[in-house]
Design a protein with these regions (language model features):
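Core catalytic DNA strand-manipulation module of type IA topoisomerases
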Residues: 1-207
Length: 207
């Protein structure tokens, strides 16, 4: 409590810029990079000076540090995660998502869309494994079981998934096809190995 009362808020400015670099292989092509200034001035005048100097100068990359990181696939969809993904990826409101999912379910293309479970049945996992081996290679397969976070979820129920994972595309309307594709991708990727990503830190200065 004493530390909270003694805390004095400090104003500072975060400065970032978008830079374009000339590709080595194709001189005509540029690649945008977002860089953040290490200095965070607490005065507006100083921040404006840095921005002004940065805009009117040529920059030189002085260092690139790269590290490999792994990222695990996300669990198969529950009702809530399907709504969230459809909102961010497709721009669908929750009610629109559920309406489309209802039609896909009625056509026998996906499992029941109201579920808190991330569980996949043994038969579904076998089909998904076959799809991965055939299309991406056996090395990309990693069978996973996801533990449902909801205490009230019934593990006997399955996650929202394609009823026939071998079908990459399904649905009649564009909305149905887009949502089905989203569900298919999430379901199949849930049984794949971790993605290996390269994270790079670029340091640039004004020479």
């Amino acid at each position: 409590e004493r530390e909270i009362r003694a805390f004095i808020p400090v104003t500072y400015f975060v400065i970032a810029g978008e830079f374009k670099t000339v590709g080595r292989m194709r001189e005509s092509k540029t690649y945008p990079i977002i860089l953040e200034c290490e200095v965070q001035p607490n005065k507006k005048e100083e921040a404006e000076r840095i921005v002004r100097e940065g805009k009117n100068s040529s920059w030189e990359i002085v260092g690139v540090d790269s590290t490999e990181v792994s990222r695990s696939p996300k669990a198969p969809f529950t009702t809530s995660t399907l709504q969230q993904a459809a909102s961010s990826r497709l721009g669908y409101a929750p009610s629109r998502t559920m309406g489309i999912a209802q039609k896909l379910y009625e056509k026998g293309l996906i499992t029941y869309m109201r579920t808190d479970s991330t569980n996949l049945g043994a038969e579904a996992i076998a089909e998904i494994s076959s799809v991965i081996e055939k299309n991406y290679g056996k090395d990309m397969l990693q069978v996973r079981q996801y533990k449902t976070k909801s205490k009230n979820a019934q593990e006997a129920h399955e996650a929202v998934r394609p009823t026939h994972p071998t079908s990459r595309s399904a649905g009649t309307t564009d909305d149905e096809k887009r949502l089905y594709s989203l569900i298919w991708e999430r379901t199949v990727s849930s049984q794949m190995k971790d993605a290996l990503l390269k994270r790079s830190k670029v340091t640039a200065n004004i020479p």
